[in-house]
Amino acid sequence: MVKLFIGNLPREATEQEIRSLFEQYGKVLECDIIKNYGFVHIEDKTAAEDAIRNLHHYKLHGVNINVEASKNKSKTSTKLHVGNISPTCTNKELRAKFEEYGPVIECDIVKDYAFVHMERAEDAVEAIRGLDNTEFQGKRMHVQLSTSRLRTAPGMGDQSGCYRCGKEGHWSKECPVDRSGRVADFTEQYNEQYGAVRTPYTMGYGDSLYYNNAYGALDAYYKRCRAARSYEAVAAAAASAYNYAEQTLSQLPQVQNTAMASHLTSTSLDPYDRHLLPTSGAAAAAAAAAAAAVTAASSSYYGRDRSPLRRATGPVPTVGEGYGYGHESELSQGSSAARNSLYDMARYEREQYADRARYSAF
């Protein structure tokens, strides 16, 4: 019995149709269709060879089918990477394209690239040679051997190869190369795991240069900075003040009056000459004269009566008239006299402007 593989089967194909097609060359013992491929068991080897010779690339429902002798699935199938695939391409169309060169175990499209697993390595090489850099559905696709491998669960399988560095003899979880591609250092990890003694942290700040107990280094540093900054600030301020004085003097207008110019340029004036203050006798005389002038002015000013409450005194009514208007007038006259005595005696006993002469003399 010979087992034949039929690939790239159309969707319309049925088992009865395939069976009748292969029975033309010999007795068919079994026929199975799995998705877009199938298997046919023929009793005679010669009949199987005739079926392969006549039915390979046979057009069935408008699709060319592939017929060849079936082989057991290889443990290490050849994986191809197919790049630059058209977005309208489907798995079925891509699989049919690669089945022209041999049996395809798996075909998966991921975005604009795909992975095709071919059963035999020689078929994969032929597919690369025939399909690489060729037009397929309006785009030029690129076919090459895939460098990625099927990853098993961590710790499962044999130590045949690491997925990080590609070397054999260890799993990826034990690989000395981390995910970024650098060689990892497991010394600290093992020390933490097995309780190695680490260098203790200092309790105080004595070991640090800028944080010692006395803060001596930091204090001296800031003192030097403050001294330098203060000296620079004073020097800058002095220079700016000197420049401002020069600019101000240069911007003063020229003296137009000749008399004033001669007066200013006269050598008889001493800029450092000081005049003596007046003596005590002269100051007292000036103060007395000023006080007399102020007294005369204030007496004439404050002598007038401007109060609206002060009225001319009229005849005082008798007591028999009761508490009428006359009694209220009597009370108002008494209160006005009391107010007049207060104004004349307490407030104007001392002149307010008598002390001004003492200051105006200077």
From Swiss-Prot:
It comes from the Eukaryota. A zinc finger (CCHC-type) spans 160-177. Pfam families: RRM_1 (PF00076), zf-CCHC (PF00098). Phosphorylated. Phosphorylated in vitro on Ser-307 by SRPK1. Phosphorylation on Ser-307 is induced upon cell stress signaling, which alters its subcellular localization and may modulate its activity on IRES-mediated mRNA translation. Phosphorylation on Ser-307 is induced upon cell muscle differentiation. GO terms for molecular function: cyclin binding; miRNA binding; mRNA 3'-UTR binding; mRNA binding; pre-mRNA binding; pre-mRNA intronic binding; pre-mRNA intronic pyrimidine-rich binding; RNA binding. Residues 306-336 are annotated as: Disordered. The keyword Zinc-finger applies. It is found in: Nucleus; Nucleus, Nucleolus; Nucleus speckle; Cytoplasm. The keyword Magnesium does not apply. Residues 2-72, 78-148 form the RRM domain. GO terms for biological process: cap-independent translational initiation; circadian regulation of gene expression; circadian regulation of translation; enteroendocrine cell differentiation; entrainment of circadian clock by photoperiod; insulin secretion involved in cellular response to glucose stimulus; IRES-dependent translational initiation of linear mRNA; miRNA-mediated gene silencing by inhibition of translation. Keywords: Activator, Cytoplasm, Differentiation, Isopeptide bond, Metal-binding, mRNA processing, mRNA splicing, Nucleus, Phosphoprotein, Repeat, RNA-binding, RNA-mediated gene silencing, Ubl conjugation, Zinc, Zinc-finger. This is RNA-binding protein 4.
